[in-house]
Regions:
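A short beta-to-alpha transition loop/helix N-cap that caps and shapes the active-site region
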Residues: 19-22, 72-74, 168, 175-178
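Surface loops and adjacent helix of pleckstrin homology
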Residues: 53, 74-77, 171
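Acidic surface patches and DE-rich sequence motifs
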Residues: 42, 66, 92
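Residue-level detector of conserved, well-ordered beta-strand and adjacent loop positions
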Residues: 51, 65, 169
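C-terminal, non-catalytic macromolecule-binding modules
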Residues: 77-93
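C-terminal helical cap and adjacent loop that interface with cofactors, partners, or active-site loops
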Residues: 58-62, 88-240
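Rossmann-like dinucleotide-binding domain that binds NAD(P)(H)
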Residues: 1-47, 51-58, 143-147
Length: 240
């Protein structure tokens, strides 16, 4: 969205169901599916594929195909490098077809590179604080933030509707806000009620006892002791 100054208009969601024969899923206390893909249709006609979940070969990779070349972060060796590719007939004379380099952030490079997700963990907080300091709205303002988050909600609606396309409403428009004003659709068990969806395409199910026991041990080792996620030392979780 930032690079192309576009927003998603429609989404299709697809999932790989929960696999009880996969130890990484069976021993998890979460009630969710293995992985998911969201296909977003942007308002300029572009298509974005977002793949995420509990798949082997974990990594954070971005690949962008434009009409003047390709840019992606490297999947081998130093993964913070960028690879830029231009077709031989589209590049300038003397310009290489392929360039691989490690970029610097234009601001706060040192601090950003010491945080996770390639600097993303730093810049989310940095730009939030800059908005407070300067009283200026950042590019990723509340509406663009909603655009990004509601794409996932609508994609889950799509999953439960045989992956049919669903709109991503633009809440800058009063008519769209009015249409969804009383929409409280959520798979959160804390909001359970009539018409609320499950968090897995397989429906509602309970993690097995061994998975819950393991979760208690892990969370206790990190100091979480209650279902309110209060940090009170190294006590055990009382419940999930």
């Amino acid at each position: 969205m930032y690079i192309t100054d576009t927003r998603p208009e429609k989404v299709n969601g697809f999932v790989i169901p929960f696999d009880a024969s996969d130890p990484s899923m069976a021993m998890s206390a979460t009630v969710a599916d293995t992985a998911a893909t969201i296909i977003c249709r942007m308002d300029n006609g572009a298509v974005v594929k977002s793949l995420h979940g509990h798949l082997r070969g974990h990594g954070n990779y971005v690949r962008i195909h434009g009409n003047r070349g390709l840019m992606e972060n490297c999947r081998h060796g130093e993964k913070n490098r960028l690879r830029v590719w231009k077709e031989p007939w589209e590049k300038k004379r003397g310009e290489p077809t392929e360039t691989v380099y490690r970029p610097d952030f234009p601001v706060r490079h040192g601090e950003a590179t010491r945080t996770g997700h390639g600097g993303g963990d730093f810049f989310t907080t940095y730009h939030f604080l800059e908005a407070i300091r300067t009283d200026k709205s950042p590019y990723l303002d509340v509406y663009r933030g909603v655009d990004m988050s509601i794409a996932g909600i609508q994609a889950w609606r799509s999953v439960l509707d045989d992956s049919a396309p669903y709109e991503v409403p633009d809440f800058r428009k009063e008519a769209a806000r009015r249409k969804y004003r009383n929409d409280h659709w959520s798979p959160d068990p804390g909001r359970a009620g009539k018409g609320q969806p499950p968090s897995s395409i397989l429906g509602r199910f309970e993690p097995k006892a061994e998975a819950k026991d393991l979760a208690r041990e892990v969370w206790a080792s990190r100091g979480y002791v209650t279902d309110r996620n209060q940090r009170l030392g190294n006590h055990r979780l009382t419940r999930i």
